[in-house]
C-alpha cells in the first residue's frame, strides 16, 4: 500500500480519556507526556510547568480543548500504597487539587480496570486524598484540610460598590460571597462571570491574598436554593465557570460554615451548581480547619488519541 507524504509526518500521540462530573469535564492523560522523574507530585508539577508546559497547552487549549476543560495527568505514585498520582491543570496553568477532577479520575481508573469499588489513596501536589468508589460508581473524595483564612473581607468593586466575602482554602484559594445581588442561574452565567471577574480584579488591586501571598484565583457566589442547601456559581482561573458544584469550592464553603458554627461535623450539606448538578458534602473536625468529604458522580464521554503534527502551527495550542 502506498503511504502518502501526510501519513509519514512525524507526530506525537497523547492518549486521553474524557469524562464529566456534574457537567464539568475532566481529561485524563494516560500516556504521551514526557517523563517527569520520580519525585512527589508537587516536584513533578514543577518539572512539567518549567520544562514541558507546551504539553499542557496542547491538551487543554484550542484547537483540541476549551476554556472549561480540566486536565489530569495520570502519574505513577510515590507510595506503593497509593492507587495513582495526579497533576491537575487547565487553560490558565496548574491546580493544586481538583474535586470534580478527582471524581473523574477515579471513575476513569475503574474504566481502565485499575481499581474496583473500595477506598483508594490518590497523591496530589497538595497532599494525599482518599477516594471511595461506591458500588453505584459514585465517588466520595476525602479532601485535604480546608480552612478559613480571613472573614468579612471588604473590597471596592467598580460599578458594584463594596463587596464582602471570606477567603478560604479548600485545595485552591477562594473568595466566597453570599451578599452579591446577582441571580445565580444557568441563563445568567455571562453576567455572573463578569461580576466575579470584577471581584477578582478588585482583590488583586487591593492586595488581598491567601496564606503566604498566594493569589485568590477562584470566586464563588452563593445563593439560596428551594431544593438544596445552596446554589453556587464558581469562576475558575482563566475565566471559565465551573459546571459542577466545585469540590474544592464546596470544601472551602464547609470550612466557613464550620467556623461560623452553622454546620456541625458529620451533617450532610447538599450543594447545587449553577446548572443544577449536585454534590453531597460533610466534614470532620480537625486541628486548624476541617477535613471535607465530597460525593458526586462522573460519566465517561470519550477515549481518544490526540495527535500533534510537527508542522502544525497550532499543534501546541492557541494562546488565549
From Swiss-Prot:
Enzyme Commission code(s) on record: 5.1.1.8
Catalytic activity: trans-4-hydroxy-L-proline = cis-4-hydroxy-D-proline
Active site: 98 (proton acceptor), 246 (proton donor)
Cited Gene3D superfamilies: Diaminopimelate Epimerase, Chain A, domain 1
Residues the entry annotates as binding substrate: 99-100, 218, 242, 247-248
Entry's transmembrane regions: none
Keyword hit for Isomerase: yes
Gene Ontology molecular function, alphabetical: 4-hydroxyproline epimerase activity
Taxonomy, superkingdom: Bacteria
Pfam families, sorted: Pro_racemase (PF05544)
Family annotation (InterPro entries): Pro_racemase_fam (IPR008794)
Alphabetic keyword roster: Isomerase
Described purpose of this protein according to its UniProt entry: Catalyzes the epimerization of trans-4-hydroxy-L-proline (t4LHyp) to cis-4-hydroxy-D-proline (c4DHyp). Is likely involved in a degradation pathway that converts t4LHyp to alpha-ketoglutarate.
Homology family: Belongs to the proline racemase family.
Protein name as catalogued: 4-hydroxyproline 2-epimerase
Organism, scientific name: Burkholderia pseudomallei (strain 1106b)
Amino acid at each position: 500500500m502506498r503511504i502518502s507524504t501526510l501519513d509519514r509526518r512525524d507526530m506525537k500521540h497523547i492518549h486521553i480519556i474524557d469524562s464529566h462530573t456534574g457537567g464539568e469535564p475532566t481529561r485524563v492523560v494516560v500516556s504521551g507526556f514526557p517523563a517527569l522523574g520520580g519525585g512527589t507530585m508537587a516536584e513533578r508539577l514543577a518539572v512539567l510547568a518549567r520544562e514541558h508546559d507546551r504539553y499542557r497547552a496542547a491538551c487543554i487549549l484550542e484547537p483540541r480543548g476549551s476554556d472549561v476543560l480540566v486536565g489530569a495527568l495520570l502519574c505513577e505514585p510515590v507510595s506503593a500504597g497509593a492507587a495513582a498520582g495526579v497533576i491537575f491543570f487547565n487553560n490558565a496553568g496548574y491546580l493544586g487539587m481538583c474535586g470534580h477532577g478527582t471524581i473523574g479520575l477515579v471513575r476513569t481508573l475503574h474504566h481502565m480496570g485499575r481499581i474496583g469499588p473500595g477506598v483508594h489513596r490518590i497523591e496530589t501536589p497538595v497532599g494525599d486524598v482518599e477516594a471511595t468508589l461506591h458500588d453505584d460508581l459514585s465517588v466520595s473524595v476525602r479532601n485535604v484540610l480546608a480552612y478559613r483564612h480571613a472573614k468579612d473581607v471588604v473590597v471596592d468593586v467598580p460599578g458594584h460598590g463594596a463587596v464582602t466575602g471570606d477567603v478560604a482554602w479548600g485545595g485552591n484559594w477562594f473568595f466566597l460571597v453570599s451578599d452579591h445581588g446577582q441571580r445565580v442561574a444557568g441563563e445568567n452565567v455571562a453576567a455572573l462571570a463578569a461580576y466575579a471577574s470584577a471581584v477578582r480584579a478588585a482583590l488583586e488591586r487591593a492586595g488581598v491574598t491567601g496564606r503566604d501571598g498566594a493569589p485568590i484565583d477562584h470566586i464563588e457566589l452563593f445563593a439560596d436554593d428551594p431544593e438544596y442547601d445552596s446554589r453556587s456559581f464558581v469562576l475558575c482561573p482563566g475565566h471559565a465557570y465551573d459546571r459542577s458544584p466545585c469540590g474544592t469550592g464546596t470544601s472551602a464553603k464547609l470550612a466557613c460554615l464550620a467556623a461560623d458554627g452553622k454546620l456541625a461535623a458529620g451533617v450532610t450539606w447538599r450543594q447545587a451548581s449553577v446548572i443544577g448538578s449536585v454534590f453531597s458534602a460533610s466534614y470532620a473536625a480537625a486541628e486548624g480547619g476541617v477535613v471535607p468529604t465530597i460525593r458526586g458522580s462522573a460519566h465517561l464521554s470519550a477515549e481518544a488519541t490526540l495527535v500533534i503534527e510537527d508542522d502544525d502551527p497550532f499543534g501546541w495550542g492557541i494562546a488565549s
